[in-house]
Amino acid sequence: EEFLGRAISHRRSEYFLASKCGHYVESSENDKKGNSWGESDLRDKEWTKKTLIESVDRSLRRMKTDYLDLIQLHSCDLDILQEGEVIDTIERMKEAGKVRFIGYSGDNEAAEWASLDSRFDSIQTSFSLLDQGAKDMVFPGVNKTQKGLIAKRPIANGAWGADKSPSTYASEYFRRYEIIKSNGIDVDIDLSPIELSLAFALSHQNINVHIVGTANLSHLKSNIKQIETEQLLDEKTLLQLYEVYDRSNDNWVSQT
């Protein structure tokens, strides 16, 4: 956030600026040490009005702006969502002009519930050819309530087609890929594994934003080219990828 503040605060009108709240907030003792995160026992992780306000105010301060276009409750459990205080608190900040839109970022039952709640303007949830649960659990509510839909991890962290897990973060996706591969993948298409992964996500046109992170400029250019050329999958290929996922699925849940 501090990086963004330095880079774009003077060009604020050019950007749709989104952030999340509900993650760890540093204590005053931690701040004095000059440590951005500190030890876990110095973190306040309660879903309270106080910590939510502090989290949003911190984002505004760090990004050198007086409002966020989108604030997202990040991985808030279903029972906390249903209590209502967290949403009420964010709504008060919206009324105060600190945020324009309210979103939920998470997965599974909590995302399904949030997808049907009219107070949320958008849902950010995991979706890829190795994480298809949101298609049946979250997409219907988003479509019904006409929310914005943001797909995180849309290329499954590069696990599809990999020889080994690309990272610890991708280990569950790689495990799923190994199972799917052992069950037989009958997809005849002239795309690299990453291109196939991105094409699968892009072929779901109810998704408004795909979060495809990279630190490699050539990868970024390749992704942009694929989007510009509208390199999508036909219905037959999509159905094949749905089928092999469903056939391999052993109660898989969406990964946060």
For each feature predicted by the language model, list its residue ranges.
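N-terminal binding-site loop/beta-alpha segment at the start of enzyme catalytic domains
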Residues: 1-23
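Glycine/proline-rich, positively charged
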Residues: 30-128, 203
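Conserved, mostly hydrophobic/aromatic
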Residues: 4, 17, 59, 68, ...
